[in-house]
Amino acid sequence: MRKVKYAGIQMQCTKSVEENIAKADKMVRKAASEGAKIILLPELFERQYFCQERNYDYYLYARSLEDDEAVNHFKKVAAELEVVLPISFYEKDVNVFYNTTAVIDADGSVLGIYRKTHIPDDHYYQEKFYFTPGDTGF
């Protein structure tokens, strides 16, 4: 049986998408240089966690799979480093919003997506305000 090394990355996110992508890029490269072949980044790492309050302006953060900055950036990185990168992003599909993960293969192609099914709803987690339960199964 072949062994596969993976890495889980934790990072503090800022309000700047560009800063967060740059920080994540640096950490992905470090993990890959240490032999990781599957590298997991934090959920919705493109910006600070915004789901703690209800704010209609935050709907503007959502992007399609094809237009998301992190997905497009890390497709190139995955191909360059030959690693698999599950990338979490705030997806807008027509007029429906999802908490989605795109799984990017080691050649830079998107293997598929998973839309989060179980959306928490609590005083500090207003995710049901932002996300529709996913339709991609388990």
Predicted regions, residues:
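Active-site beta-strand/loop signature of hydrolases that rely on acidic residues for catalysis
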Residues: 6, 20, 28-57, 78, ...
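A short acidic, glycine-rich active-site loop
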Residues: 58-72, 129
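N-terminal phosphate-binding loop and adjacent alpha-helix
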Residues: 10-27
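Active-site-proximal beta-strand elements of phosphoester/diester hydrolases
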Residues: 3-15, 100, 113-116
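Catalytic metal-binding/acid-base residues of hydrolase active sites
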Residues: 12, 45, 90-91
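Beta-strand-turn-beta hairpins that frame and shape the catalytic cleft
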Residues: 1-6, 135-138
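Active-site catalytic loop in hydrolytic enzyme cores
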Residues: 63, 76, 92-138
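A structural motif corresponding to the C-terminal end of an alpha-helix
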Residues: 70-88
